[in-house]
Amino acid sequence: DRGFLHCDLLIIGAGPAGLAAALTAGRAGSQVILADEDFTLDGRLNSEQLAFGDQSGADWAAQTVAELASLPNVRIMARTTVLGAFDHGIFGALERVSDHLPQPAPGKPRQVLWRIYTKGSLLCAGATERPIAFENNDRPGIMLAGAMRSYANRWAVTPAQRVAVFTNNDDGHQTAADLHAKGVAIAAVIDVRPDAPLSGDYEVIAGGQVINSRGRLGLKSIEVALPGGGKRQLSCGALGVAGGWNPNVHLTSHHRGRPEWLPQIAAFGPAAEGPKALRVAGAAKGDLSTAGALRGGADEAASWLRENGFRASRLELPEAEGAPISITPFWAVKGCNRAWLDQQNDVTVKDVKLAHQENFVSVEHLKRYTTLGMATDQGKTSNMGGLAIMAELTGKAIPEVGTTIFRPPYTATVIGAFG
């Protein structure tokens, strides 16, 4: 089915930033649409063990959603992906109405493609974790550390009884700490930083690197290069890989805006010249702290409200984790070839090296020669690694190499929805 909606402010994403923004705008009396692709409205708050004052982050999110649901001027759209930003403040959004039901209700469509007309919009789409490339990193049991943490905290599931974590930033240590607290054995945290923090009652190999994996039908062990030389085998059934977080800036590029480099998080942030009246807050803007996301979402919403004739009061926010993430950029283990960057299109480090050898060094040529980032995810986890490796091969800084931009739809969409 298809439909049309109008609002003052469209808020895209219902994590900490989106919820704070929606609460600010909703209390001010503006017509608000809050859209999120998940079936719960909390972003990563259900995936983390975060304290919001004297309550958990997940409880704060549930309390906030309950208040928003009680406001007649706020429309909450779960299971709704805002898939494109178009001219004149128009957005396309796909609502999955009955895909999740074993038996759809009579008269209900499978999906609805909404055309949303807005006066303003706020992108609070969060960030996507990226991997680190190493030899044979496609073996079952190797996954992103944030996903491993989500399984544990949100679903009470662990991929193995003994896990290891490979990281270049503090966030990887949080995965180990959360799993350890739930009784999962931690083989080790392998941190490429020589000054890696000691985060718990388990081994931390500072300055180490995972250089290979082994196992016939799944991961059985990893090979670790030690900082002082030599190698070591670690037995584990799963490996969480934490290479940093990329802001989900896709909608800011739908009017040809080009993402800009943010050295503090070693990732590309939102384009300065994005769609008209589209603001960005939270992790999508490069602020990876929870406190920063909360305040950023509330402040961006309040700023828009004041500019458009609404009276916005300052939102009282709970105390939350506010430390900036510490990261050392590390994209791929030296000397690896059979190391996957884009697992959907089977693009390896070797393919990027071959593209450089054949002089396909422009990011647009690299993309088309290797198909890096041309799968249905548009390179959400893979692009940064490939671009960083090409930058190293050409002797340039990553901002000089640049990045490709994104086009609608944000995620793969059923063709029939456009009919």
What are these regions (language model features)?
Residues D1-G419:
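Residues forming the flavin
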